[in-house]
């Protein structure tokens, strides 16, 4: 059975690109258009991995991450920070506990390697 990955991304084109890449790598992908939807989907049926854009309106990726980690049903799910603000956010994301960081634009090989590493680690 393939791992389930929840993508939280407000830009349709970015979300579609992630979905296509991950689906082509045989992952089951669920999509959230905003932070609230991400929390709802994660709590209803916890995925194996969550990829969250840090710069979403209303409820940004930072707050989504805090809420996921505060909830016992989602606290152990690895989360990948995804953002275009690489210089500013990389250190902060890893410091607060994100499992990994992917900058935009991302390299497909790096993205897939990061996902594979975290999904494999989660399955152990």
Positions of PLM-derived features:
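Conserved acidic carboxylate
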Residues: 9
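Active-site beta3 strand of CheY-like receiver
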Residues: 45-51
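Charged docking surfaces used in two-component/phosphorelay signaling
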Residues: 16-24
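Receiver (REC) domain active-site loop signature in two-component systems and cognate sites
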Residues: 56
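Short hydrophobic/Thr-rich beta-strand motif most characteristic of the beta2 strand and flanking loop
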Residues: 26-33, 41
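C-terminal output helix
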Residues: 106-116
């Amino acid at each position: 059975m393939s791992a389930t990955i929840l993508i939280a991304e407000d830009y349709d084109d970015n979300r579609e690109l992630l979905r296509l890449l991950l689906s082509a790598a045989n992952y089951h992908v669920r999509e959230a258009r905003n932070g609230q939807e991400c929390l709802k989907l994660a709590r209803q049926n916890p995925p194996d991995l969550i990829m969250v854009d840090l710069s979403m309106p209303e409820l940004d990726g930072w707050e989504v991450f805090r809420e996921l980690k505060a909830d016992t049903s989602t606290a152990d799910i690895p989360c990948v920070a995804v953002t275009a603000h690489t210089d500013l956010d990389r250190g902060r994301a890893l410091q607060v506990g994100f499992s990994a960081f992917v900058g935009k634009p991302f390299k497909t090989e790096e993205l897939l390697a990061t996902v594979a590493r975290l999904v494999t680690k989660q399955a152990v």
